[in-house]
């Protein structure tokens, strides 16, 4: 089947396009295009979130910070993770970071330790502010996510937790369209995330006094808490 009169034929070979002089399957070209768009939007969104977080910190008179799920320069050579750590680096430039934690090593300019967000190794009221930017969808199932929120509430006077919206058409971790709405596909990608959240599911994890922003179709939800 094809548009012969326009010299365009749709056939098995129509799945091949050219990118920078090399043959690229259509599916791969689409994936790369979506990925570039996701990365560009991700950088825009992270900068927007950074301004919001810095304004929140100033309003609350924050003295020091705990970064939950901190990343540093270890991903600098990976173009797919080029935007990771943007928010954390900016916060570290403006506020003292008392500690950054992750379950994997990170190269940071501030103190860092391996730790689990579900069992933070800190005393009550350890820090003035804690941030978990797009971390809660990685820590496990509902009970694990709830425990993470409880731990952040225990160790910090104020916190911000952000997470991607499960019902946004683009899945930011894998740069796919709509597939993350299929339970079987999500199960196969548990290495990328464990439990994506809707607004209702996220709200159910939070303290009653926490404020949640982001509409039903927003790409990201942001929760703010002040004790």
Language-model-derived ranges and their functions:
Residues 130-131:
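Hydrophobic beta-strand segment of the Class I
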Residues 158-183:
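Conserved class I S-adenosyl-L-methionine
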Residues 209-220:
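Conserved S-adenosyl-L-methionine
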Residues 135:
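Hydrophobic adenine-recognition pocket in adenosine-nucleotide-binding enzymes
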Residues 139-156, 163:
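A short, conserved alpha-helix within the catalytic core of class I
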Residues 123-126, 154-155:
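Alpha-helix C-terminal capping/helix-to-coil transition sites in glycosyltransferase folds
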